[in-house]
Amino acid sequence: MTRKQRALFEPALVRTALIDALKKLDPRTQWRNPVMFVVYIGSILTTAIWLAILAKQTDGSAAFTGSIAMWLWFTVLFANFAEALAEGRSKAQAESLRGTKKTSWAKKLAGPRREGATEKVSAESLRKGDVVLVEAGDTIPCDGEVLEGGASVDESAITGESAPVIRESGGDFSSVTGGTRVLSDWLVVQCSVNPGETFLDRMIAMVEGAKRRKTPNEVALTILLVALTLVFVLATATLFPFSQYSVDAANGGSVVSITVLVALLVCLIPTTIGGLLSAIGVAGMSRMLGANVIATSGRAVEAAGDVDVLLLDKTGTITLGNRQASEFLPAPGVKEQELADAAQLSSLADETPEGRSIVVLAKQRFNLRERDLQALNATFVPFSAQTRMSGVNVQDRMIRKGAVDAIRRHVESNQGHFPQAVDDLVASVARTGGTPLVVAEGPRVLGVVALKDIVKGGIKERFVELRKMGIKTVMITGDNPLTAAAIAAEAGVDDFLSEATPEAKLALIRQYQAEGRLVAMTGDGTNDAPALAQADVAVAMNSGTQAAKEAGNMVDLDSNPTKLIEVVHIGKQMLMTRGSLTTFSIANDVAKYFAIIPAAFAATYPQLNALNVMHLHSPASAIMSAVIFNALVIVFLIPLALKGVSYKPMSAAALLRRNLWLYGVGGLLVPFVGIKLIDLLLVALHIAG
């Protein structure tokens, strides 16, 4: 599921952001953003000049200088507001999570068994390794692993999903989260973390903007922006002595004022992206949480945007996960109804989706009704990992169904013969992407039940989109190569790994990484932990084991393996937003150059009026218009920074062309229109002469 998203400009968030924007005027906060720190210094300098003019300490227009100073302060405040609004949204999410933390008591056990005596202690006093008993109605006091028992657990406080889930000892569903509630039965849980280190505590820390560290790409972009700013600072600094020399040489004109030079500098440096960069990063983490995915850092979100190989589990991601019986294929000399009757009998007590589907198919094909095993004096033989088959004993009949090699051993151990024709049936089912289940009665092989993996609707189209983006999809399955190849062809994946083991997955990831690729995968079991730790983007399922969650750098609260595709989408959207706004910000400089340079030097060099292509009213209105536009464009781009640019699956080259046209050419044209409109408004209001 997806968490309900707050409105972008929710009044309560806006009020808080306005207050925080003022608090961020603290120099200790401002110097962390080098680009905006230059604007901050410029604001202080022009304010000092304005006060000096008012005090008759220097010459100049108090109205013009005061207006420039005011709009420079607005530029700083708008950038502060963008960051504060993004952080405010994250803090609101953190507060809602913090609200789920309750002070609770725990029933501490002396040992790992339920029968031991319990001691009532505060949940905050529990330490890693402590064992607790949690019964129906109790809140689970800590993150941990289920040692004994099984229970229905309400995890809605963490996941937002109202449907309860089953947590039990052993297997891949043994991990529990502190703050969730047991609805029925009981669990013996061993705490896996100390207080303050729980999953909920980590979630809160991750989504709070104050805890966010800059990602490598952000650091690289900041270095670029600082370099551009230094270039423009040096270029602007040379204009003052150049202006003095020009006035002396021409015996006319006027020296460019410090106020105009500060205005020029602020308009030329990349203030738009400088003011929004932090907000984009915070918003990316926030959007990931909106998809019910917790990222351990911005680095993980950023890596998701660069991923070019996806390793996807077949079951639950590419297929629906519940294989359905689709056909009865009898052995030579066996009637189809005889096979269906035996298969149904062996499945009457089988509660797996496959077993239930065999009962239903026999009923549909031959109107075979369910029978009472007790009335038949039958004994059900459950499936086990050792025998790899299940079945039923009815009086003197011994019916078994299972994997082909398991049934072959069973038949041969009963002095029977496994027909070549059945081997051929098994191979034909595997070639079409099905899973063959062989049925035998005593030493006699009756035939094959074909189980069909149902490929999810629309998944093939999603893989086509990923291919357009240059992302390779690899299906991971434990099936034999024939079955895997058939399902891979039907689903449209680029490659597959059959008969996959944890070691094979780890080797495949390392192989792709050695080729310079970034790999993303999902996992939920302890056996997935090595591969999750190796992958660049590792999404662990919340329903999985503690080892899997600790190995991953993201946790999907919905435990939906398909979410990996959405994670990549959000990562790419964040990178695109940053790149698009950087392009727009730098392209903006051209129009501001044409606005301010002619205005600054027109008195000394009237010929520069030829560069006044926008036909701005006067030097003062031209400079004012450029400064006002420079401030307002930050406000207008806040929604884009927080929501992200619209994203369409396409190749990197096509995306680059699209964004250069949209944000590059747009960044060139929009300021010309905006500055001209502001100039007309200033003249109409008689604000600038």
UniProtKB/Swiss-Prot annotation:
Transmembrane segments: 35-55, 62-82, 220-240, 260-280, 594-614, 622-642, 665-685
GO cellular component: plasma membrane
Keyword Hydrolase: no
Transmembrane in keyword set: yes
Residues the entry annotates as binding ATP: 350, 354, 383-390, 401
UniProt superkingdom: Bacteria
EC number: 7.2.2.6
Key words, A-Z: ATP-binding, Cell inner membrane, Cell membrane, Ion transport, Magnesium, Membrane, Metal-binding, Nucleotide-binding, Phosphoprotein, Potassium, Potassium transport, Translocase, Transmembrane, Transmembrane helix, Transport
Membrane topology designation: Multi-pass membrane protein
EC class: translocase
Reactions the enzyme catalyzes: K(+)(out) + ATP + H2O = K(+)(in) + ADP + phosphate + H(+)
Signal peptide: none
Matches recorded under SUPFAM superfamilies: Calcium ATPase, transduction domain A, Calcium ATPase, transmembrane domain M, HAD-like
UniProt-annotated binding residues for Mg(2+): 524, 528
PANTHER family from the UniProt entry: POTASSIUM-TRANSPORTING ATPASE ATP-BINDING SUBUNIT
General function of this protein: Part of the high-affinity ATP-driven potassium transport (or Kdp) system, which catalyzes the hydrolysis of ATP coupled with the electrogenic transport of potassium into the cytoplasm. This subunit is responsible for energy coupling to the transport system and for the release of the potassium ions to the cytoplasm.
Quaternary data: The system is composed of three essential subunits: KdpA, KdpB and KdpC.
Family from the record: Belongs to the cation transport ATPase (P-type) (TC 3.A.3) family. Type IA subfamily.
Protein name in UniProt: Potassium-transporting ATPase ATP-binding subunit
